[in-house]
Amino acid sequence: MPVKFGKVLIPQPRSKFVKIRCPDCGNEQVTFSHAAMVVRCLVCGRVLAQPTGGKAKFAGHIVKILE
């Protein structure tokens, strides 16, 4: 007898990569939505993402959510 397998539900991750625009210089930078370290702008050095233990708190404008 062949073994029947039911549907396997695989949960999708809640974390994504996001593109953030720096409010000071306008530089766009890709970072992780659940960043564990402070993310600074590569051009001017302003803090763009502050870790909170879960999702990061973003100081810049989120331009796009990448998948």
UniProtKB/Swiss-Prot annotation:
GO biological process: translation
Pfam families: Ribosomal_S27e (PF01667)
Signal sequence annotation: none
Domain of life: Archaea
Keyword tags: Metal-binding, Ribonucleoprotein, Ribosomal protein, Zinc, Zinc-finger
Example GO molecular function: zinc ion binding
Binding-site residues, Zn(2+): 22, 25, 41, 44
SUPFAM superfamilies: Zn-binding ribosomal proteins
PROSITE patterns found in the cross-reference section: RIBOSOMAL_S27E
The UniProt record lists the keyword Phosphoprotein: no
Oligomeric form and interacting partners: Part of the 30S ribosomal subunit.
Protein family membership: Belongs to the eukaryotic ribosomal protein eS27 family.
Stated name of the protein: Small ribosomal subunit protein eS27
Organism for this UniProt entry: Pyrobaculum arsenaticum (strain DSM 13514 / JCM 11321 / PZ6)
Source species taxonomy: Archaea, Thermoproteota, Thermoprotei, Thermoproteales, Thermoproteaceae
